Amino acid sequence: MSYLFSSESVSEGHPDKVADQISDALLDQFLAYDPAAHCAIETFNTTGQVVIMGEVRSSQYIDLQTIARKTINKIGYTKSEYQFDGNSCGILTAIHEQSDDINRGVSREDDDNQGAGDQGMMFGYAVNETENYMPVTLDLAHLIMYTLAQIRKEGKVMTYLRPDAKSQVTVEYSDDGVPQRIDTIVVSTQHDDFIQPKDGSDEAQKEADEAMLAKIKADVINILIPRVKAQLGDKVLALFNDHINYLVNPTGKFVIGGPHGDTGLTGRKIIVDTYGGRGAHGGGAFSGKDPSKVDRSAAYMTRYIAKNMVAAGVSDEMLVQLAYAIGEAKPVSVYVNTYGKSHVNMSDGEIARHIEAMFDLRPRAIERQLKLRQPMYLETAAYGHMGRKNEVVEKTFTSRYHETKRMRVELFTWEKLDQVDRIKKEFGL
């Protein structure tokens, strides 16, 4: 018997993602001028208001308000009619210094033995159903949102689009976990009130709302989806069919949105950020945290390990868990689940022991392996932290306190497949 599985994504204009992007933009600014900075920055946004809170230990000052406003404007909140825009919103900052107690637990004379910034468990996952070893449901949901944002920013078609949006993709799987077809695609997008009623009656308003909805649904099917499909390989493209159930703005009108429609908070989209409900999640959010926080760095490391293991052919699917105690450098446990899809004559426990022997899993070693002290985090804060393109980009940082810095930054280092040959040798593949 087949089954259905769904994953969702949200746009960069979703209130929670606005918060994530502000937190990570501030983190990047600190790391650009002070790579050793320790940060835990939380952002809250609502109608006309942003609150930036958290703990920082750094030798440098940065202009929090300027960076926050720039980030909001870049997302697309630039009009007063949105009831939230980067130029006029109020910004309250409440940043204070990191606790000495936490700093003592993390800092060591020997940097290699830097302790974990907190206790907790972190998971990494990979599956071979897409080219980037991600669940196809989440990969498509992200691509729909990213493509919709590109259409909005180009401003040539679907010119009524506003920044807030969500998507959800449901795929039918066979009993053995192979994707068969796309069953349902949900797209909810904020929009201008672009068709006005002919008079003040309720009937005229209903007629105008229905006309807007019909236009948006037609554009999603005839403009957005073809652009999404044009970016796909044959394997995923084959999942599209003539019987997909398209649910576009199912509640009807979606004019009020963004932080005016819902409050946003850093760290509230952790399943969107990771694997769309597949694998597992330890509960720790990423954005605003420097890599001494294993919530972030160890989650990236487990993804790196799982992806390279699946790419090497150890298993068709793999979940890796690391768990840490605050102040301790080495993980207290390493766990592997291959879901019965392993191609090596080993138990999952034996595979875990090989991983522990192959990879240095101390926090400072993870930072070095994945080059996590770079200002590389704003790009992670929308459309997923996993399954993204590893590339080197030029970034420019300006500050009224410091000289302008131009840097080459390597993004999504945990997506590299540079351990495949080593893993094949280790496992005799």
Predicted regions and their residues:
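N-terminal, positively charged regions that mediate nucleic acid binding
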Residues: M1-A40, N45, V420, E426-L429
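Short glycine-rich or small-residue beta-strand-to-loop segments that form or flank ligand, phosphate
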Residues: L4-S11, Q49-R57, L92, M122, ...
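Glycine-rich, mobile lid/loop segments that gate access to catalytic sites or pores
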Residues: S6, T66, N73-Y77, E81-I256, ...
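Alpha-helical support elements that line or immediately flank enzyme active sites
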Residues: E12-L31, A126-Q150, K289-G313
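Short, charge-patterned binding micro-sites
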Residues: A40-S58, I326-K330
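Internal helix-turn-beta structural module
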Residues: T46, S315-E317, Y324-L429
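C-terminal catalytic subdomain
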Residues: I270, Y275-Q321, K330-N337
